[in-house]
Structures are given as C-alpha cells and as structure tokens.
Amino acid sequence: MNKRSFKLKIACVFLIVAMAGCTKLHEQVIDEVLGSSSASPQNALAAAYGQMDNGTFVNHAQAFALQEYSTNEAILPTRGSDWGDGGIYRAIHEFTWDGTNSMITNTWNSLNLGITESLTAINSVTQSNDPNKAQLLAEAKALLDLYTFHALDLFGQAPYRDPSTANAPLQVRKAATAIDSLITDVESLIPNLANIGQNNTGNGRFTKQAAYALLADMYLNRAVFKDRYASTFNFTEAAVDGNGTDMDKVITYTSQLIGSGQFKLESNFFHNFDIANANGTELIFVITQYVNTLTNSSNNFAYMPMERNQKPSPANRGTNASCITPEFYHTWDNNHNDPRFQRHYQYADGTWFMNDGTDVSVPVTTAVIGGTTLPWFHFNRGMQVGQQYGPSLSGSSDYQRTPDGRIKVNMLYCEKAPTQLMDFTPALNFDDPTQGVFTQLEINQGVRPFKFEFDPTGLNSRSNSAIPMYRLGGMYCMRAEAYLRKGQTTQALADVNALRTSRTREALYANAPGTALISIDMPTLYNETGYEMYWEMYRRKASIRFGTFEAAGTTKPVSQPFRRIYPIPQSTMDASKLFAQNDGY
C-alpha cells in the first residue's frame, strides 16, 4: 500500500458516507460525544488527520498568516480595491492585531478543533479491539501533541481534557510547563509508532520519523516556550530527561533523520513543492491533498502570490495578493545564482520560458481540467521579479496562438489596472509608510514567490500538492542552528553547505550546484534558513529565536515582546472564564 493509502481509504469512506446522505465524515465525528465508542477508530483518526488540511495549515489566512505575514519575509497589502477586508491582513504585518482579528480567531478555533478531534480519536481507539490498536493510539496521541504544540507556539496556551477520565474537566495547558510534558509524551510514543513505509504508513501518517522531526522542533524552541518574553534565551538548558542539553537533543533527533538513509535532499529544490510531490525523497511528514475527493485541499500557497492576469490555464488565474518584503528580497543580494532563488521551466521540445521579453511562444501541453482538455502554461518557479510575461486569453477557453499553433507569449499587464505593466518590483512604495495600502495603479508591486507549483486541475482553489510539515532540508537547518548555538561552527557550516551544494540549477545553467560558504555566523545562518524555508511557516519561530522579530521593517514599527504570541480571541474570552488573556492584550 503506497504512502497515501490510509488517507485514500478514508476518502473512499467519505464517498460512501456522502452517498448515504452525510456530506462529510468530519460532521459525524465532531458530533460524537467525547467518551462515546460509536465512532470507528479509523474514521475518528482520519478526522484528526483531516483537520490539518481543513484550513488549519493549508489556508493562507490561518496558521500560515500568523507564521509568515507577521515576519520580515512576507506581507499581504491592500491592493487597490482588493484585500482590504477591514485591515485584517495588514494588521498582522503592521503589528496592530487584537483579539477580534478573524484570522487569529479562525486559527485558534482550527487548532482547538484539531485537539478535540485528536482526543476523540484517542478515546475511540482506546475502546476498540482493533488489531492495530497500539499504533493507531500512538498516532492519535501524536496528533494531539502536534496540534497542542502549535497552539502553545502561537497562543501560549491550549485546552486539554484527559480522555482516559469520564467527564474530565477542561484544563488549560501553558507553554512554559506544557512543553516538557509534550516532549515526554512524544518520546514515549515512539516504540508504538511505525517506521515510515511499514505497516501501511507513508509520509502522510505520523511515524517514528515524524516524531523525531517534531521532537527536534520542540527542543529547538523549548527555551522560547519556557521564557517567552526574555531578552535572551537559554538554549543550553538541560534536556527534559537530563541527558545533554536542548541543542544536543536537536542534534540527536535531526541526525536520526539525516543519517537514516531513508531520505535524500532533492537536487531540484522545487520538486519538494510540485503537484506530484507525494513520493518526494525529502518529505518526512506531509499534509496529503487531493483535488478529486471529498477531503479538503488548498492551492493557496501558489494562488495567493500569482497575479490575476497570470493564467496557468484559460480556466485558472492568480489573485494578486501576497508577496515578499524588500528586506527579505535583499537578503538574496549576491546570491541570485542559488538554485533555490529561481528556476526556469523547460518544455518537452526544449523551449525554455525565459520570462525576460525574449520569449515568442511555447508549445502546447495539456491538463485535464473539469473534464475538458485545456492548454497548460508553466510559469517559472521561485522569485518572480521585474516585468512579467506569459499567455493572454483568446475568448474564454483558449490562449492566443501563433500561426503555427503555439501559445503566444506577451508582455503582461495587471488585470485590475489594465494600463499598469505587471512589473513585480522589489520595493514596496506605500503612500503612508506605516500602512500597507496600494492605490489601484500600484498593485503590481512586490516580488512574488512561486515556490509551490500551481495546480490547474483544482480550478484555483484546490491542489494535489502535498504540503510539507517536516522535510529533510528543515532538519539540516535545525541541526546547523543547534551546532552553532553550541559553538560547533565547523559542523554548522558543513550542514549549511550540504544544503547549498546539493541543490542544482536547471540544464540552462549546466545543472550547476550552489556554491559553498567559507564561514558561518548567526546572521548568516538566519539568512540561510530563509533561503531554504521561506513560505513554509518557519520564519516567525526562527525570527524570535534569532532576535529579529521586534525589529522595524516595511510598515512595521519596533514592537514589544508581548507580540511574540497572539491574544486569545475575544469571542473565546467572552464565552469562557477558563482562559486568562495573554499579557499586553
């Protein structure tokens, strides 16, 4: 059974349930009373997994927004008549958010639903006689720890109810103390988790390898969790079990993955984010996605930065929303030959899409979209900067063609400002530098990261691309940071250079590998983690650890440490006396 088989099996269950008159298995499971044994263990576990792609980690306006738009990497400005929405997007980057921001509320609710569904799965599996009970129970508990970790990271606290006790009271876990309990729990689950690829598992299931990655993440951020508002963090504190320090544990767990032989760095960096990436050699734990099932999926990470007149097929377009900041773009200065910066697409007949004004046409390839065969235009990947080129529509179902039937490449203009060239400028020039608001004639601004491949079969909104939660490149970043915090500069440099030199450019540039560094320090490592992990919900935690989170930037003033976590939503505070509001809110 392949890596996605478990979720595919559950997708079939979804279909059967739908045909019987219930639209989603989620609805059935959510309605189960905690403590009931009526939910089948596999269905309950599927619901816990399913909450990951029910917006939580795949919608740009939930965890992604809080982890990315709050940093010096990404921004979603108001673009003329679009993306105002009461200022909810700008507030995250301008650090003016409060407990009424709907993205904060939705993220909190989604994580809490993940916690609830994990607790339901734990209870269901515990009461079952499933022959694979030990493994399923370990997976359910691991998902509970994963959702709780993210809630503690973003909000500093998380709800909990003991699933082993009938009518157990609702409790509140606090980050400073709960992080150690989470670490201990995940470590205790490892014996009962399957090795990846065994017992019908793959990278879409929580395996021993996913546990090692989560533990490395927990230990790397443990010092922050324990003293959130500190001016400096104690990264050398003794580990939970007393064996070594936090950074020693990061090295241990990442090394188990790096040295296992089960994973391999992709020479083409962007393969990690392709539509057909499910069997990627680098992927440790992913959110599996399908277009053609009743499970959820999202194309957001590709759709949001693409302009509305960039059309991967005549039936698709981008939405001209998010972009990277000038600060992040300029970290790439003198590093544009890095294979992770940009990659040109080559068509089967050898045509390269240069996107520089020299293109005349590209050959026609096809993608099946909505039961029809439509031409598919492949945009380049990575950072898209400067004047953009691509196809224009001829009618509603085809591109403009050259006399020999190829797709004509044109200079592009912004859809909602037809006289404005689609020039993705590195600079973001706002009339009021404290507010990210563009006029209608300024909506072109901002370099766009095309890290994830746009899936034209999903009609803009859905995708078959698996979303990496943990991958091997991230493990190298974590281990390099742990080495450097221990003063082991040689080892840190070796890990950074392993990432740099394993990635290669396209054949247009003779498949040249990235160049190695000759030295490393903390600012350099911070930039290197950005090159590797941009657009992957990594930046906020890294910025806090590296001490850059409070710095002023584009539309952002110098901020106070209380902004390192978000407020408990006002709707929750109004409805319950259980939670105490976080400091500063």
Predicted regions and their residues:
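Long, intrinsically disordered, low-complexity segments
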Residues: M19-L25, L111-N112, S181, F273-D333, ...
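Membrane-proximal, proline-rich intrinsically disordered regions
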Residues: C22-S70, W97, P569-Y585
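Short, surface-exposed recognition loops and adjoining beta-strand edges that mediate ligand/DNA contacts
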Residues: G35-A39, N59-P77, A194-A210, V224-T331, ...
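Conserved, well-structured interaction surfaces
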Residues: S37, Q42-T56, G80-F155, N167-D180, ...
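Short coil/turn linking the two alpha-helices of tandem helical-hairpin repeats
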Residues: N129, H150-L154, P159, N221-A230, ...
